[in-house]
Amino acid sequence: MAAARPTIAVADLGSGNLRSVAKAVEAAGGAAVVSSDPDLVARADKLVVPGQGAFGGCAAGLDRGGGELRQAVIAAIDGGRPYFGICIGLQLLFEGSDEDPSCPGLAIMPGRVRKFAPVPGLKIPHMGWNQTRRGPARTGLVPDGDEAGYFYFVHSYYPAPERAEDVALTSEHGEPFCAAVARDNVFACQFHPEKSQAAGLALLRRFVQS
């Protein structure tokens, strides 16, 4: 008899390619449920938080209905529920962002989200495939070895963790930047695994099966 697939809540913050993320989670072996219902988030085995667009818009999505979804996400993380953040779902883990300074993040990790500095000849947003390398944080979701693979990025802002030990992956766009973080039950990436073909699917599969 096949083992039951874990129920994975894909949090609907009102933006992001939710259908693509849900399909990728299903392909990785999870039972994806797209929802903004705090009760469903509280019951799910694991949590994926995607987001596209502006930091403030996604933060507002957490705060719809009196902030119950924000509290459900924080409670899930504090309770040890596996969390996988994608793009803005990574940035929301921090205290805030230079993009929308008045909007608070979840403050799970110390640090802020910064904008790439303008460099002659450098295109912003950073868009396309880029190589990643291992950072100090160790996680079973990322294979051993300095080079951790190529992933697809679309962003103008990047996380700047205060703790170097939270950095799981780095990449470079004019300057080195944090491409993923990991601590305990939390993993989040600035790139889009659902757009990153085999490398992205392998990463999601390790999350689903962990």
PLM feature segments, named:
Residues 175-182:
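Short, surface-exposed beta-strand/loop micro-motifs that present aromatic residues
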Residues 189-210:
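Acyltransferase
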Residues 48-50:
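Structural motif
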Residues 4-9:
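Extreme N-terminal starter segment of soluble prokaryotic enzymes
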Residues 44:
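An anion/phosphate-binding loop that grips the pyrophosphate of nucleotide cofactors and donors
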Residues 53-127:
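Cysteine-nucleophile active-site neighborhood
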Residues 148, 182-187:
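Beta-strand-turn-beta hairpins that frame and shape the catalytic cleft
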Residues 95-173:
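Pocket-forming structural segment of enzyme catalytic cores
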